Amino acid sequence: MDEETIKKYKEAGKIAKKAIDYSKEIIREGESYLEVTKKIEEKIKSLKGDFAFPINLSVNSIAAHYTAKINDDSVFKKGDLLKVDLGAHVDGFLSDTAYTMEIGTNENKDLTAASKEALKAAIDTIKPGVQISKIGAVIEDVIKSKGFTPIANLSGHQLEQWDLHAGLSIPNFDNKSDTVLEEGMAVAIEPFATNGIGHVVDAEKSEIYQLIAPKPVRSPTARKILEWSATNRLELPFCKRWVSDNVKSFGIDMSMRQLIL
């Protein structure tokens, strides 16, 4: 990895850190998911970054990947356990970071501490040549030692330019893999601790999409969506709200359904 690449990764990381710090200032009981999301997006843009992926505000039993809808009227409530997951990119070089907070209470401090300690232990383990299974084992050991369970089917991942989930997945448990980290790799480590069974299931609907490959479509709106995503997001994730903001056309919902594989 050359110095210019490292510089851009670091800049993306600094932007994300400032956005995280800003989010902690504005998230309060009664605040709107949508307005908070828009404010964080504006912050990232003001720092000369762009979005690595839609900002995730995942509350309580929603483990990950919830992003505000077009007319989302959800508000934060006292006692909510909120996972804020965001990232920035500079010329396609990505950052991906997250934290967990409670709204107005502190009843889950041991759970959040378990994930924090697992992250620190994993970072201390990382070096060229280390097996990803060893990283997973460290995460698993720390989380279980605190009385919680790692989520097995959520994981960290390798980062490459314009590719958020590139190549390797970094497990949250010992998956016995012989695969090793190589010098020059960029990775996101994502420990998930739960007081549940340690397995998530997909929701029926999603607001987050990714262009896998262009496909022939008859709908003019669908063609506009393809053109916008290919030009502005390449292979990076995007959300329906961004499509609605940027593709001024009727039938966004129907056209999005036509594009799903």
For the regions a language model picked out, list residue spans one by one.
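Active-site neighborhoods and metal-handling regions in enzymes and metal-associated proteins
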Residues: 1-261
